Amino acid sequence: MADLVSVERLSKNYGPVKAVDDVSFGIQEGICFGLLGPNGAGKTTTIEMMEGIVTPDAGRVLFRGTPIGRDFKQKVGIQFQTTALPEFITVRETIELFSAFYPSPRKFDEVVALCSLEDILERDNRKLSGGQRQRMLLALAVLPRPEMVFLDEPTTGLDPQARRNFWDLIGRIKAERATILLTTHYMDEAQLLCDRVAIMDHGKILEIDSPQALLAKHFEGALIRLPYDGCCQDSLKDFKGMLIGDDFLELQTTGLDASLRDLIEAKIDLQGLSIHKPDLEDLFIKLTGSSLRT
């Protein structure tokens, strides 16, 4: 299947800082594609170049095989990290206002139901909670029935229940076969919603594939994780597959009982030990040695 969007060797510098460094990837139509990485990885600059907001120093973005131009903006919906809503008007009035900007917007009742706005239609924009505000911004992004929706860290700062409610809304957008580009710091979010993910750090793509394929490629068995204060470094050298972070130890093992015995015999303090199945955050730590939320 041909890619809906193709990113070809994008680069962007800000003075001496190489924010995006020769990045290439494709996004197939109808999938949710996750662009993951810590703050400063280059993902926001990448997404802004894809949206046509920032001009790349090198490379190009293709939409259906054609370089993006003015008409591209009519085919996408964007939910930015931060957006100022009109003050002193209600949610209902805001939807009606933005609907007037498009030749063929969704029907009012349709977008209200899609984004679960029924209970806040008469509320002033200034009085919206974080979760309500994000639902509202998503509604504005999907008003023109875009072929592609950009969601730049849409659940940052939301409480756990509001995040889960927003996931349901993204699921509804996916069900319409819209193509979604999602940036997020939350790995449970990416693992649940994304069909494919690209992991970025220092302006480069480290890995790209489905979450399941990436985890199968990099991990077998379980992960043992322990707090670490810098002691017993000589003992740790004997452990194959041991990752030593700033404040943690992580050991990948296919023989859990034997690994626990080895840790005890090495006189490693097991207080705070946890054992779990690897996830995307573990993969990022393995690739870069840093946490996704730093």
PLM segments and residue spans:
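ABC transporter nucleotide-binding domains
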Residues: 5, 12-182, 187-195, 199-201, ...
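Short, charged/small-residue-rich alpha-helical element at the C-terminal edge
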Residues: 220-294
